[in-house]
A protein has these predicted regions:
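C-terminal motif of bacterial Sec signal peptides marking the signal peptidase cleavage site
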Residues: 3-7
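N-terminal, intrinsically disordered, polar/charged segments of Gram-positive cell-envelope systems
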Residues: 10-55
């Protein structure tokens, strides 16, 4: 079974879905403590025509509930930040709620999570790029993939097609997780190639995704 293209190493703790027909909707209904699951044998859904090395970034408009949509970019050194990240405290994504649990590292259940990490495109307080995500989603789920892409670009000066899609169930204000896809362009995925669903969960906490209310399990 394909987990990664040659030369591409996944972060530890992956859960392979196996059946390439298993979709994101199926993953949303699954439970468990894994940070992410592999989709479509780890092959992203980009087309041949998508594989262009011209840098760009696109962030979908917020919907009627104030929720983010797809964030999509061809990432290269041209887009990466040249200064430290500023404050994002003025942005309150859909479902934003400040709540603490003593057993969570940093205490806070929710973070303002960038769909495309600041280290990749230097987008900071962009409301179209920030969701309400758990500490676990942010640090254990998304960050290892972001770091992998950033390190690859810095080392090779190549470009990576990168797309993150928040998945909401109905009118929920908090997404169930995010679909992350990436593929390196110049080497046709030999360096970076993944397609994963990262769960917006926090071990030990039950989350009401419709409202963002929560309680310790």
């Amino acid at each position: 079974m394909l987990f990664a293209a040659p030369g591409c190493t996944l972060p530890q703790g992956d859960t392979s879905i196996g059946d390439s027909q298993t979709g994101v909707k199926d993953l949303v209904t699954e439970s468990g403590s894994d940070a992410y699951a592999i989709i479509n044998n780890n092959i992203p859904d980009f087309t041949e025509s998508d594989m262009q090395s011209n840098v760009f970034e696109h962030y979908s408009d917020l919907d009627s509930l104030g929720r983010c949509g797809v964030a999509y970019s061809c990432v290269g050194t041209e887009l990466m930040p040249t200064e430290k990240r500023g404050s994002i405290g003025n942005v309150k994504p859909s479902g934003w709620h400040s709540v603490k649990y003593d057993f969570i590292d940093g205490k806070y259940l929710y973070n303002r999570c960038h769909l495309i990490g600041y280290q990749l495109t230097a987008e900071n307080a962009n409301r179209k790029n920030l969701i309400t995500g758990t500490r676990y989603l942010n640090v254990e789920g998304m960050l290892p993939f972001e770091n992998m892409v950033a390190d690859y670009i810095k080392e090779t000066k190549n470009h990576v097609l990168y797309r993150v899609t928040p998945i909401f169930d109905g009118n929920d204000l908090v997404c169930r997780g995010v679909k992350m896809e990436a593929k390196s362009i110049e080497d046709n995925g030999d360096g970076i190639c993944f397609n994963v669903f990262v769960y917006n969960i926090q071990p030990g906490v039950h989350i009401d995704y419709a409202t963002s209310d929560s309680y310790a399990e």
